[in-house]
Design a protein with these regions (language model features):
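Short amphipathic, positively biased membrane-proximal segments
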Residues: 1-123
């Protein structure tokens, strides 16, 4: 397995796992859906889970990997408001939970970088 392919498979696995958890534990995600979004939070929880699964499939397949990587980067940008919402909402929680919530915000930058790296054609 080439290094670039390994990165793509790992990113696809991360996205797929995240997508599955949106369906397995939607109650975790519902409270962090930004309140400015219209409609019920559960809709957005499931919609983001579907998006993560679709993007995972695109990243995993070599023929769609470039578009999948770009879609993954866009998805990581799109979920930034939810991570910011979680950080705000959890600001008074126990230190460990607060650290997790605060850590999700800056973690988006390396995830975006990773997705863009996967999107680049191999040399």
């Amino acid at each position: 397995m080439t290094h670039r392919r390994g990165e793509a498979v790992a990113l696809a696995g991360l996205l797929a796992a995240a997508g599955v958890t949106h369906f397995a534990r939607p109650g975790f995600y519902d409270p962090i859906v930004p309140r400015a979004l219209p409609g019920p939070a559960r809709f957005w929880t499931y919609a983001s889970g579907v998006a993560e699964l679709a993007v995972a499939a695109a990243v995993a397949h070599p023929a769609t990997r470039r578009r999948g990587g770009l879609a993954a980067a866009a998805l990581f940008v799109a979920v930034l408001p939810a991570n910011a919402q979680m950080a705000w909402d959890w600001r008074r929680r126990r230190p460990v939970k607060r650290a997790v919530a605060y850590g999700r915000v800056p973690m988006q930058a390396p995830l975006i970088w990773w997705a863009l790296r996967v999107a680049r054609p191999s040399r």
